[in-house]
Amino acid sequence: MMKELLMNNMLNDVPTPWAMYFQDSATPNMEGIMELHNNVVFYLIIMLCFVTYMLYNISTVYNKSAVAYKYMNHGQFIEMVWTTFPAVMLLIMAFPSFMLLYICDEVMAPAMTIKAMGLQWYWKYEYSDFMDEKGETIEFESYIIPEDLLEDGQLRMLDVDASVVCPVDTHIRFIVTSADVIHDFCMPSLGIKIDAAPGRLNQTSALIQREGVYYGQCSELCGVMHSAMPIKIEVVPTADFLTWIDEQ
């Protein structure tokens, strides 16, 4: 347990006080989201500098003379600049954004499927590709561990009694739904945030590229115990995953 906590802190895979940036990415989708964010912030800084310069220039020029504005009737060049420049910036930001949106939304040839169902106020998981000894689909419920029952190294409001186990370097499809109200299945390090709506099956995928323990939470206000719906995913080698499946 202490080893897991140490690795999570080293890799920034858990929420931390006063955090100002993303958790470390563990999937290509999350890596793309972080890269898009950094690029957009860079373009916004350029636009901010340009607008600030224009405001400063105008305020200093017209501050020198109360009648200076009378001698400027047209400014076709500046009008062209303030029309063309924002349009080009928007196109530069829009194309990578749309590409990433469609890539994250596309689920192609997954190796396995995990179904997550949100309920007030816990999660229910189903491994539809695997059967237990009785010939039934492997499924279990996951509840938050109360604060007074936490052991050393476990995280308050994040640890659960039964975590999702996934194999590393495997294309996994997550099918998300709800049995009552709208929930949201959110895993920051994996770049997953998808609504769990009753009567609807939403899907997304993840290729988790490193082992570790990842935490998420329900990110849709779903009732008085909304904060008591954490998500915990343990990513292990394929051999360990198969051993875990055999034990279910």
Swiss-Prot record:
One of the record's GO cellular component terms: mitochondrial inner membrane
Cellular localization per UniProt: Mitochondrion inner membrane
Membrane spanning stretches: 40-56, 88-104
Binding site for Cu cation A2: 218, 220, 222, 226
Short name of one Pfam family: COX2_TM
Highest taxon above the source species: Eukaryota
Catalytic reaction list: 4 Fe(II)-[cytochrome c] + O2 + 8 H(+)(in) = 4 Fe(III)-[cytochrome c] + 2 H2O + 4 H(+)(out)
Annotated keywords: Copper, Electron transport, Magnesium, Membrane, Metal-binding, Mitochondrion, Mitochondrion inner membrane, Respiratory chain, Translocase, Transmembrane, Transmembrane helix, Transport
GO biological process entries: ATP synthesis coupled electron transport
Residues in the Mitochondrial intermembrane compartment per record: 1-39, 105-248
Mitochondrial matrix side: 57-87
Keyword Transmembrane: yes
InterPro entries, sorted: CcO_II (IPR045187), CcO_II-like_C (IPR002429), CcO_II_C (IPR034210), Copper_CuA (IPR001505), Cupredoxin (IPR008972), Cyt_c_oxidase_su2 (IPR014222), Cyt_c_oxidase_su2_TM_dom (IPR011759), Cyt_c_oxidase_su2_TM_sf (IPR036257)
GO molecular function: copper ion binding; cytochrome-c oxidase activity
Binding locations of Cu cation A1: 183, 218, 222, 229
Entry EC number(s): 7.1.1.9
Subunit structure: Component of the cytochrome c oxidase (complex IV, CIV), a multisubunit enzyme composed of a catalytic core of 3 subunits and several supernumerary subunits. The complex exists as a monomer or a dimer and forms supercomplexes (SCs) in the inner mitochondrial membrane with ubiquinol-cytochrome c oxidoreductase (cytochrome b-c1 complex, complex III, CIII).
Cited function: Component of the cytochrome c oxidase, the last enzyme in the mitochondrial electron transport chain which drives oxidative phosphorylation. The respiratory chain contains 3 multisubunit complexes succinate dehydrogenase (complex II, CII), ubiquinol-cytochrome c oxidoreductase (cytochrome b-c1 complex, complex III, CIII) and cytochrome c oxidase (complex IV, CIV), that cooperate to transfer electrons derived from NADH and succinate to molecular oxygen, creating an electrochemical gradient over the inner membrane that drives transmembrane transport and the ATP synthase.
Protein name: Cytochrome c oxidase subunit 2
Annotated source species: Brettanomyces naardenensis
Organism taxonomic ancestry: Eukaryota, Fungi, Dikarya, Ascomycota, Saccharomycotina
Gene: COX2
